[in-house]
Design a protein with these regions (language model features):
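Accessory cap/linker subdomain of secreted extracellular hydrolases
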Residues: 1-74
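Conserved alpha/beta-hydrolase "acid-adjacent" motif
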Residues: 90-100, 109, 126-127
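General small-molecule cofactor/ligand-binding pocket signal
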Residues: 115-117
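Catalytic active-site module of serine/aspartate enzymes centered on a nucleophile-bearing elbow/loop
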Residues: 126, 130-181
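Surface-exposed acidic, glycine-flexible loop patches that form ligand/cofactor-binding
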Residues: 70-76, 178-181
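Short beta-strand/loop motif that positions the catalytic acidic residue
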Residues: 77, 82-89
Length: 181
């Protein structure tokens, strides 16, 4: 929908996510309606991406540093945690968040196994290649190129990342079937 000409607006004063019907703590956005959408719109136009919200998240974290309550307690997860991201993700700074979770695992005792990879190029769509082709049987590569400037500039690197992700996910699932259950 639209609200005052904006395609998206922040939920103010409430969490986007819940667990066992209880709202989870969250980092509030520093931009209110309609500035929230205008920041996204301006960055999207400036970069040539289908959508670009990274500035929104970066500015929000600068205005409200994430507290311990708002951090996902990754160390409490049982099983394997597979984190995949790309430096050129323009929706949010995935690489920074993966590094933060990796550091958290070093600082807290845990029983889970962490497997992570950060690609230089892969865009926000760091999907396994086979999954992308299932979702978009025709033109999946073209769609990613249309969506993100980085995919236009680095198409082969993005494709190689998706192929590698495909193998990593398959390996993680195969190992989970053998061991973690």
């Amino acid at each position: 929908g639209k609200r005052d000409g904006c395609k998206e607006w922040p939920m103010e004063g409430e969490s986007l996510f819940s667990y066992k019907e209880e709202p989870l703590p969250y980092m509030p956005f520093c931009y209110k309606h309609p500035d929230y959408w205008h920041v996204i719109e301006k960055e999207t136009k400036r970069t040539g991406d289908m959508i670009n919200s990274r500035k929104l998240f970066d500015d929000s974290e600068k205005a409200h540093p994430i507290t311990e309550d708002e951090i996902i307690k990754i160390e409490k997860i049982h099983g394997t945690v597979l984190l995949i991201g790309a430096e050129d993700d323009v929706l949010w700074d995935t690489a920074k968040y993966i590094r933060r979770m990796k550091q958290r695992m070093k600082e807290h005792s845990h029983t889970c196994r962490l497997d992570y990879v950060i690609y230089e190029h892969g865009t926000h769509f760091v999907f396994p290649e086979s999954m992308l082709k299932t979702m978009l049987p025709v033109g999946s590569g073209l769609f990613v190129k249309l969506a993100f400037q980085a995919a236009r500039k680095y198409p082969e690197e993005c494709r190689r990342a998706r192929l590698d992700i495909d193998q990593r996910v398959r390996n993680a699932v195969a190992k989970w079937k053998r061991v973690d259950r």
